[in-house]
């Protein structure tokens, strides 16, 4: 009985750790606009380097809900679109040194993806990740 309880605890901890570790190469799919998280509800965004997902630009958006009954949600997004959006916002703001460095890093990423743009690097359908499914949500409480 103790080993069963221990296995259950390990399984629960593994699920929590998997939720916290980015699994960036995931299937990007179109969402109904009512399901797209508000920019104000996003806690962090993980954008891949070109070599991470075989040249495909993927961004994983993490939305943790504040209410106890609401679960955490991951959404796989087109990384190039996320980069372009963030750059458009940053270009309109006065930037401090850290934000300026962030903007330059985004420009570097954007240029890297542009230099490798082709049929193989514009589709993330080849990635079959459970975190690319909007329906897969979990409570971390």
From Swiss-Prot:
<keyword id="KW-0325">Glycoprotein</keyword>
<dbReference type="GO" id="GO:0016020">
    <property type="term" value="C:membrane"/>
</dbReference>
<comment type="similarity">
    <text>Belongs to the herpesviridae glycoprotein L family.</text>
</comment>
<protein>
    <recommendedName>
        <fullName>Envelope glycoprotein L</fullName>
    </recommendedName>
</protein>
<dbReference type="InterPro" id="IPR038313">
    <property type="entry name" value="Herpes_gL_rhadinovirus_sf"/>
</dbReference>
<dbReference type="GO" id="GO:0046718">
    <property type="term" value="P:symbiont entry into host cell"/>
</dbReference>
<dbReference type="GO" id="GO:0019064">
    <property type="term" value="P:fusion of virus membrane with host plasma membrane"/>
</dbReference>
<feature type="signal peptide">
    <location>
        <begin position="1"/>
        <end position="19"/>
    </location>
</feature>
<dbReference type="GO" id="GO:0019031">
    <property type="term" value="C:viral envelope"/>
</dbReference>
<dbReference type="GO" id="GO:0020002">
    <property type="term" value="C:host cell plasma membrane"/>
</dbReference>
<keyword id="KW-1160">Virus entry into host cell</keyword>
<keyword id="KW-1043">Host membrane</keyword>
<keyword id="KW-1168">Fusion of virus membrane with host membrane</keyword>
<feature type="region of interest" description="Interaction with gH">
    <location>
        <begin position="21"/>
        <end position="131"/>
    </location>
</feature>
<keyword id="KW-1040">Host Golgi apparatus</keyword>
<keyword id="KW-0472">Membrane</keyword>
<dbReference type="InterPro" id="IPR020175">
    <property type="entry name" value="Herpes_gL_rhadinovirus"/>
</dbReference>
<dbReference type="InterPro" id="IPR034708">
    <property type="entry name" value="HSV_GL_alphagamma"/>
</dbReference>
<keyword id="KW-0946">Virion</keyword>
<dbReference type="Pfam" id="PF11108">
    <property type="entry name" value="Phage_glycop_gL"/>
</dbReference>
<keyword id="KW-1169">Fusion of virus membrane with host cell membrane</keyword>
<keyword id="KW-1162">Viral penetration into host cytoplasm</keyword>
<comment type="subunit">
    <text>Interacts with glycoprotein H (gH); this interaction is necessary for the correct processing and cell surface expression of gH. The heterodimer gH/gL seems to interact with gB trimers during fusion.</text>
</comment>
<keyword id="KW-1032">Host cell membrane</keyword>
<dbReference type="GO" id="GO:0055036">
    <property type="term" value="C:virion membrane"/>
</dbReference>
<dbReference type="GO" id="GO:0044177">
    <property type="term" value="C:host cell Golgi apparatus"/>
</dbReference>
<keyword id="KW-0732">Signal</keyword>
<keyword id="KW-0261">Viral envelope protein</keyword>
<comment type="function">
    <text>The heterodimer glycoprotein H-glycoprotein L is required for the fusion of viral and plasma membranes leading to virus entry into the host cell. Acts as a functional inhibitor of gH and maintains gH in an inhibited form. Upon binding to host integrins, gL dissociates from gH leading to activation of the viral fusion glycoproteins gB and gH.</text>
</comment>
């Amino acid at each position: 009985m103790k080993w069963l309880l221990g296995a259950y605890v390990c399984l629960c901890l593994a699920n929590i750790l998997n939720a916290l570790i980015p699994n960036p190469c995931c299937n990007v799919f179109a969402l109904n606009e009512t399901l797209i998280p508000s920019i104000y509800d996003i806690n962090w965004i993980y954008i891949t380097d070109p070599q991470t997902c075989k040249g495909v630009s993927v961004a994983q958006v993490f939305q943790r809900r504040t209410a106890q009954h609401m679960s955490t949600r991951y959404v796989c997004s087109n990384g190039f679109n996320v980069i372009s959006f963030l750059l458009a916002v940053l270009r309109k703001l006065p930037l401090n040194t850290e934000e300026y460095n962030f903007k330059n890093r985004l420009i570097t990423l954007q240029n890297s993806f542009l230099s490798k743009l082709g049929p193989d690097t514009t589709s993330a359908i080849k990635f079959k990740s459970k975190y690319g499914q909007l329906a897969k949500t979990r409570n971390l409480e």
